[in-house]
Structures are given as C-alpha cells and as structure tokens.
Design a protein with these regions (language model features):
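Short beta-strand segments
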Residues: 9-10, 41-43, 69, 78, ...
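Short glycine/serine/threonine-rich phosphate/pyrophosphate-binding segments
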Residues: 15-25, 49-50, 85, 90-94, ...
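Glycine-rich beta-alpha junction loops
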Residues: 44-47, 141-145, 187-192, 216-222, ...
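Glycine-rich oxoanion-binding loops at beta->alpha junctions
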Residues: 52-106, 115, 154-156, 168
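C-terminal non-catalytic interaction/assembly regions of soluble proteins
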Residues: 256-410
C-alpha cells in the first residue's frame, strides 16, 4: 500500500495546551512511517493552507525539538478565524481538495473549538459527497469548555488553574487593608460560565472570597447584585466578585452594553468587554465604597506557568488517540473525553469519538443545578467536577536569560 501524508492545523483562540494536542498528533503520526510519509502543518489554519503556507515537522522540529511543543503555550502553527462557506457547492471546496490531492494528503486534523469543528464538519461532508478517502478528524480545544458530547476540553483545566490561582492572589492582595472595598474580576465566557465558575476553586474555607460569582447561564439583576454586595460586607470588608464577560439581564442585554458599544468578530459573535468596569462604577456610585475592576484577559489562555499537568497529558493523549482512530478508518469525528472514577473515587479519563456534525455550532453551558438558586455562586458539584482537571505542575525549562524556553516558528 502506498504511503500518504498527514496534515494538521490549529484554529481559533490559543490555549496553554493546544500545542500539546499538536505534539500528540505529530508524534503519533511519526510513529507510523509504514503508512504516513510526511507530517505537515498548516501555517495559520485552513486560511494559510489555501495560501500555500505549509511546513514539514521533520524539518521544522527535528528530534527532541518536537518535545518543546509540550511546554509552549499559544498556537505554534498560528491560527485563523476563517469560516468556510455554508454551501458545499462553493468553489473553495474543490480548490481545497485539489490541494490535498497535490500534497497526497490522507489524513486531515484540525485542532480547535466550536467554529473549528464546523470546518471539520463541512470538509468531512464534502469528502463523503465527492467520494474522497481523506480521513478528517477534529481535536477539541477551548478554554471555554463549551463543546458538547465531551466531559471537558483540553485547555480548560490550565485556564481554570490560572483563574483560581490568580483570584487567590488577588484575595491575598485585597486583604491587606481593613477599609471596605470591592474588587470585581472579569473573566472570559460569552455564553458559558465554566471559567468564571473555576474562581470558586480559589477558596480555602467556607465563606472565603470570592463571595459572589455570576455566570451568563442565569439573568443578572443589578439591584439584587448591589444588595448582595452590601450583605457580603458582613462576612468580609474586602469583597471579591467574579463575573463572566457575558453576563446579561433578563431581557438578554449584555451588562457591558449598558456602558459600551459592542462590535462583532468574523463569526458574528459580539466582542464583549467592559462589564467589570461598568459594575465597578455602579458599586462606587451607588454604595460609596472603594471599587476597582480587573480584567484577566488573554493571560487566562496563554499562561504556561499555570499549565495543569492533567490538562497537558490529556491533550497529548487526545492527539495520539485521534491519529490511531484515523489510521483505523474513522472520519467525521471529534475526539471526546469520557470521565471515569475508580472504586476509591480517583479521577481517570478515557478518549472516545463523537460525530462532529452533532457538535459544531452547539454550546455546553454550566448545568443550572450547579448554580445556586440566587445565581450568585456555584455548588459543590462544580467543585468536584473541576478540581481534578487542575492538578499537577508542569516544569517549564528555562534558558540562560532566566525565561521559559518555548519553541518558536521561524
């Protein structure tokens, strides 16, 4: 049987472990020289591939250099937010598959979130429609943890660890003074509040900060919020509040829209930012106390220093499992995570396969039963779900300059 080539790309927002998934795909692909001749990478995703920018991993990261991917955050191959046309009759599809044929591609992998799975769905459906034998699979990635049909996603554990650790540090900082203060921490999450919920992991004891946590899964009432803040002063003069960027009122209006005009990205999603600043001003003006807001921003997704070992290992495993599945003939699937617990309650995880067509353009939100009735906190069920995902510290090698030795694409 003649050998074919494997190609992999990354898309959407990067994470601390998207390169670990890439490592899993590339390293496993290289373990099968009897079937796979070259392992290629698309520079800047499907958009870069259309422009002809591709690298060969055997040349770009030979030998042990490939290991550097496991500790490098961001997206080594670069990313894009290119949306394939809805109609499979669009000329871009035959153009893509002609390029696949010219490069003798037999396996296509795309690492990303919801919109990336949409790309995998369209390509796999076009392949089936035209009789192409290319195996097309999606590798999950998102700090938002909002992909359905999987227990969780690579990237979430490390981002959750960063959020919990940073919130704990902010708590320590706020406790320096005895004067009343409110610190509002704005955390990523448009429609799904998984990352903001992870701030609850920062607590050391019952009644510890953050005293209030608000997710987009429930409606946010500004008057009730102010009452909750006032009541929280009975527990601590320094109140920490964690909010998702996508919190909204009962009419669906984003809280940030009360103060800001909001643009949209290339997929039509509103670009949210500013609810923390709005609430800071609301608290200061209405309650007359010192208030400040902190937006964690991109550091939530790119912090290698807070990389979870569990997250890293699972990301690698997902990449390896995907290649094995593709070699066994699977296509049109996304690798999923299946949670298992041993008799003594120890957390373990297995990989599975899910139909990508049932996943793309859907969102998994935090279950309402994991949110308190008043919508200002999460329950112990969430803590039990999330805590295993942030375990373990990854040792990041440093160079002579004292800084992390990440791999860079030249």
């Amino acid at each position: 049987m003649s050998r074919k080539n494997l190609i992999v790309g990354q898309s959407g927002g990067p994470t601390a472990v998207i390169n670990s998934s890439l490592y899993g795909v590339v390293s496993e692909g290289m373990r099968h020289p009897e079937a796979i001749e070259h392992v290629y990478g698309m520079i800047n995703g499907i958009e870069g591939f259309l422009n002809g920018t591709v690298l060969d991993f055997a040349e770009a990261l030979p030998g042990e250099k490939l290991d550097g991917l496991k500790v490098t955050p961001g997206a080594y191959l670069g990313s894009c937010r290119y949306k394939l046309p809805e109609s499979l009759e669009d000329p871009v599809y035959p153009r893509l598959f002609k390029k696949f044929e010219e490069m003798n591609i037999g396996w296509f992998f795309y690492i990303g979130g919801n919109d990336s799975m949409d790309t995998v769905s369209k390509l796999s459906r076009y392949a089936a429609q035209t009789g192409s034998d290319i195996r097309i699979l999606g590798e999950p990635k998102t700090i938002d943890n909002d992909l359905i049909h999987t227990d969780h996603t690579p990237g979430f554990g490390s981002a959750a660890r960063y959020v919990a650790s940073t919130v704990r540090e902010i708590i320590i900082d706020a406790n320096v003074y005895e004067k009343k203060s409110v610190t509002i921490i704005e955390i990523m999450g448009r429609h799904a509040g998984w990352l903001t919920a992870a701030s609850a992991l920062a607590r050391k004891y019952t009644g510890d900060n953050p005293l209030l946590i608000y997710l987009p899964e429930t409606a946010f009432d500004q008057e009730e919020f102010l009452k909750a803040v006032e009541n929280s002063f009975e527990k601590n003069c320094n109140v920490i509040v964690c909010v998702s960027e996508g919190i909204h009122d009962d009419k669906g209006t984003f809280i940030c829209e009360y103060d800001n005009s909001v643009g949209t990205d290339t997929f039509g999603h509103k670009m949210l930012a500013g609810c923390g600043k709005y609430l800071e001003n609301l608290v200061r003006n209405r309650l007359g106390v010192k208030a400040r807001s902190v937006e964690l921003n991109v550091s939530q997704r790119c912090s290698a220093s807070m990389m979870s070992a569990a997250d890293q290992q699972e990301a690698i495993k997902a990449g390896e499992f995907g290649v094995q599945a593709a070699l066994n003939g699977e296509t049109g699937k996304m690798i999923s995570f299946i949670r298992k617990e041993t008799a003594d309650g120890t957390y373990t995880m297995d990989c599975g396969l899910e139909d990508v067509n049932a996943i793309c353009n859907e969102e998994k939100t935090v279950p309402l039963e994991w949110i308190t009735e008043d919508g200002s906190d999460v329950t112990e069920a969430f803590i039990n779900y999330a805590r295993p995902l942030i375990q373990g510290t990854v040792q990041i090698p440093c160079g002579e300059d004292g800084l992390p030795s990440f791999v860079y694409r030249k």
